[in-house]
């Protein structure tokens, strides 16, 4: 066992054979759209209202009480239940006014967010907090029941919590929705994409711009290679009518802002919603989003050629991808409310977390994040939870 209780395989790897749902953190103000570990002991999540909360994960958690009802999923199986009582959030990061599209962490200290309010913002966990504020974590549920009195549902008591507020330490102002955000493996460089087709490389620590170029559609999914020489950018126009739609996926020379490989024909009519480079730079994973089959492809970044396609698919589309810190495994999730762990070397499915809930509007998982040591995984659930699993413990 390591310090977090996860079983270590020979050579220091994490075992995925046994997984445990530790916590399901409730937060139902609006769709939870982004999630990130901030170091090993904190988790941050953002929602469609532009709110961001931070939880401190207890070292000695309290066991969860036995539920009065034995709720089953839509498939008839018993729902997986967390073994510990959920801690309450301790901080609210204030300043955003629109959807939080991405969250990431640098140096186990800095939380960085991208929003439809045209800004990137940085928060320092070591900074002092401000005034207290009161939140109702189940506000959306209460409001929905009040609006639909004919449903006969009984309104739950408000789940009130007091948090300390904290403004951003740094704000980078853009001009359009910032829909894409990713960070290089060495944490030195950010890549962003907006809905005007602007792609930008930034010095992560300073927040200063290094390079910018233009693509045709929304710069939707973006990623930068570990050597900082290549960038993946997927484009789309999310219009209703087929005649107005545009999709593209290209590999760019990050220094010159010129196309190295245009993969648009290979992935014709696919909205690539997620992308990630492996830590060694030898594999690029991309996932098809939208409402189609959520296919995942592993590519050779040097040639742009497809190495393999992973199966099974995420029904109704992929929403996020991330490599495990060991570089040997990939996590994926989508609108089917399932997280899958894959062996990158052979493309085989290693583990599946969560259960399908019956359709693409049955509480997607929007985003996933590994803890720095790779012993835990978090998923942002549209239903109003942040789920945290432990591997091996």
Feature-to-residue mapping (PLM):
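WD40-repeat beta-propeller superdomains and closely related acidic/aromatic-rich repeat-like regions
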Residues: 2-393
């Amino acid at each position: 066992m390591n310090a977090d209780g996860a079983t270590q395989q020979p050579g220091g790897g994490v075992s995925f054979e046994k997984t445990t749902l530790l916590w399901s953190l409730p937060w139902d103000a609006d769709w939870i759209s982004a999630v990130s570990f901030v170091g090993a002991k904190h988790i941050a999540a953002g929602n469609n209202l532009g709110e961001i909360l931070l939880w401190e994960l207890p070292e000695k958690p309290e066991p969860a009480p036995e539920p009065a009802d034995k709720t089953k999923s839509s498939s008839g199986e018993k729902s997986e239940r967390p073994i510990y009582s959920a801690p309450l959030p301790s901080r609210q990061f204030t300043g955003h006014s629109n959807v939080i599209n991405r969250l990431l962490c640098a140096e186990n200290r800095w939380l960085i967010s991208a929003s439809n309010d045209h800004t990137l913002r940085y928060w320092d966990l070591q900074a002092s907090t401000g005034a207290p504020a009161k939140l109702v974590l189940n506000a959306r549920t209460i409001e929905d029941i009040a609006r639909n009195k004919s449903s006969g549902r009984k309104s739950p008591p408000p789940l009130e919590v007091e948090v300390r507020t904290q403004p951003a330490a740094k704000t980078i102002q853009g001009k359009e929705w910032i829909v894409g955000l990713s960070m290089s493996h060495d944490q030195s460089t950010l890549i962003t994409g907006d809905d005007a087709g602007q792609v930008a490389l930034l010095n992560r620590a300073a927040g200063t711009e290094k390079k910018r170029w233009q693509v045709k559609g929304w710069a939707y999914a973006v990623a930068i290679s570990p050597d900082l020489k290549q960038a993946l950018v997927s484009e789309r126009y999310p219009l209703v009518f087929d005649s107005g739609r545009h999709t593209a996926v290209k590999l760019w020379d990050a220094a010159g802002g010129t196309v190295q490989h245009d993969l648009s024909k290979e992935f014709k009519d696919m909205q690539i919603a997620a992308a990630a480079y492996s830590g060694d730079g030898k594999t690029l994973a991309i996932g098809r989003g939208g409402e189609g089959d959520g296919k995942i492809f592993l590519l050779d970044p040097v040639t742009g050629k497809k190495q393999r396609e992973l199966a099974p698919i995420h029904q109704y589309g992929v929403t996020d991808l991330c490599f495990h810190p060991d570089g040997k495994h990939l996590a994926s999730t989508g609108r089917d409310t399932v997280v899958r762990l894959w062996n990158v070397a052979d493309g085989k499915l290693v583990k599946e977390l969560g259960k399908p809930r019956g359709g693409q509007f049955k509480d997607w998982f929007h985003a996933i994040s590994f803890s720095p040591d790779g012993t835990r995984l978090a998923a942002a659930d549209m239903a109003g939870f942040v789920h945290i699993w432990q591997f091996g413990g």
